[in-house]
From Swiss-Prot:
The lineage of its organism: Bacteria, Pseudomonadati, Pseudomonadota, Alphaproteobacteria, Rhodobacterales. The active site is at residue 158. It is found in: Cytoplasm. Gene3D superfamilies: Spermidine synthase, tetramerisation domain, Vaccinia Virus protein VP39. This is Polyamine aminopropyltransferase. The gene is speE. CDD domains: AdoMet_MTases. Pfam families: Spermine_synt_N, Spermine_synth. It comes from Ruegeria sp. (strain TM1040).
């Protein structure tokens, strides 16, 4: 009888999440972290970094759509987009669905993530790495953000959790450089974990955003493999204009974009900014 193999994630104290591994496709250590890709009966192919689930074939659409379409459609005229992280290509996939976006810069610290994602998780990028509008830069996102002189309409920080190489993407210094790199009406969105489990992540980001941006808040999306309730996606902008866009305008922009997402709708977009009390209490 074959012994069952499980991948167990222990990101949070006093709590673990296990996914059954029906087939292991990839298991190797890069310079920065241990990467695995395996098959799970519920979620399809699963990508983990140091055993922590990063994305899955089954539920990635929720995270990638909400981190992308919310800022781009709220902005309404985004032409230049910066992605920090996102080596699996899922964010790039969604950004490049917007024909109005002319140039995408994607900064990924680990070339190994990109290479094996192309080979083992092609369903995530769906050819995004071959799009002529995408400029892939292998560099530390914090270093790039400090040194860039370019301006961006939307900055999407698709980071890992604030441990290891992803830690610098949660600092006040990084956010300060990002604020400088935004256009006048630009928007930054960030991955800030699950507030019920990782409240400090949201508190620290909101403290930094409140000092840097006229509009600083978060919005929510529930992704099954990011356990503990809704995930917080940070939102910062030098203007309140984007977040106050009415539903009719969003619906018109959505229709013009010709999108057919599986999670995002203009109604979900507006509702995502309605925050429960326990999340509001995490704001400084």
């Amino acid at each position: 009888m074959t012994k069952e193999v499980w991948n167990t994630e222990r990101l949070h104290d006093h709590f673990a999440q296990s996914l059954r591994v029906s087939e292991m496709y990839y298991d190797s250590k890069t310079e920065h972290q241990r990467l695995k890709v395996f098959q799970n009966g519920t979620f399809g192919r699963v990508l983990t970094l140091d055993d922590v689930v990063q994305t899955t074939e089954g539920d990635n659409f929720i995270y990638h759509e909400m981190l992308t379409h919310v800022p781009i459609l709220a902005h309404g005229a985004a032409k230049r987009v910066l992605i920090i992280g996102g080596g699996d290509g899922g964010i790039a996939r969604e950004v490049l669905k917007h024909a109005s976006v002319e140039h995408v810069t994607m900064v990924e610290i680990d070339a190994g993530v990109v290479d094996f994602s192309k080979e083992y998780l092609p369903m995530l990028s769906q050819g995004a790495f071959d799009d002529a509008r995408l400029n892939l830069v292998i560099n530390d996102g914090a270093v790039f953000m400090k040194e860039t002189e370019d301006k961006f309409d939307v900055i999407i920080v698709d980071s890992t959790d604030p441990i290891g190489p992803g830690e610098v993407l949660f600092t006040d210094t990084f956010y300060g450089h990002a604020a400088r790199a935004l256009t006048e009406d630009g928007i930054i969105v960030t991955q800030n974990g699950v507030p019920f489990m990782q409240g400090d992540e949201l508190t620290n980001t909101m403290r930094a955003f409140q000092a840097l941006f006229q509009d600083a808040t978060c919005y929510l999306a529930t992704i099954p493999t990011y356990v503990g309730g809704p995930m917080a996606l940070g939102w910062g902008s030098h203007s309140t204009k984007a977040r106050s866009v009415d539903l009719t305008t969003l619906e018109a922009r959505f229709a013009a974009a010709g999108l057919s997402p599986d999670y995002y709708t203009p109604e979900v977009h507006k509702a995502a900014f309605a925050l429960p009390g326990y999340v509001k209490k995490l704001f400084p």
